[in-house]
Amino acid sequence: LVGSEMCIRDSDIDIAVMLKAENKAFKIEKHTHSYPHCWRTDKPVLYYPLDSWFIRTTALRERMIELNKTIRWKPESTGTGRFGKWLEGLVDWNLSRSRFWGTPLPVWATEDYSEVKCIGSVEELMAEIERSIAAGVMQENPYRNFRVGDMSKENYSTENIDLHRPYVDSIVLVSSKGEPMRRESDLIDVWFDSGAMPYAQVHYPFENKEGFGQVYPADFIAEGVDQTRGWFFTLHAIASMLFDSVAFKNIISNGLVLDKN
């Protein structure tokens, strides 16, 4: 069926016939079952594997479990049970998302991935752009009006700088061998944004280093129990990786109430 213009769903029968003819199917029958549909178009979707970027959270699994034991959970059973068991079965964090809107993955790579750069700040990106221009890869700096170190709202206007797609995708860096490096097209998991909230809200570490320890870790947070694998985890994971610390000291995790529908 490779190369045919047949619709994926319409190929089911042909695939079944082929497997039967090649004696590779034990039994073929129709079976009614639930199937994922696009929430926007209400059309059936097809899942297939993609290459992704991961954070190796498994390397800190035991430490995250230890730090979790220092948090005061209400109810305690959520911390030791639902959240604690989640940490015990922790897998690496799939960080990348194949979408358009969101925080771009700040990773640039050569075509053969022999060299990869992860950019950690606007200042670093500006320096890399200048290197690219000097090497003849880029013609000009699209952020030339942006002033590094100026944290004013005027300086951060979209007229001076916009780090979202499609603008950031036009930036082509240069490798140590002079080869062009293009940004990975994926975005960052939006839950990473949520977990980075304690730092992002005060623009840490680029601003407000003094006094940051007075408001972090948080004394108290509260959210629904459904955030066990969402906000609670991403706060805990990022704090563990960055500071070997908890992100919050006390937490109330409320239950959920649903009506009959």
Where are these regions (language model features)?
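Residue patterns forming the tRNA-binding/recognition surfaces of aminoacyl-tRNA synthetases
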Residues: S4-E5, R9-G149, L163, W231
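Alpha-helical recognition segments enriched in aromatics with Gly/Pro capping
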Residues: R99-W101, A109-E111, E128-I129, G136, ...
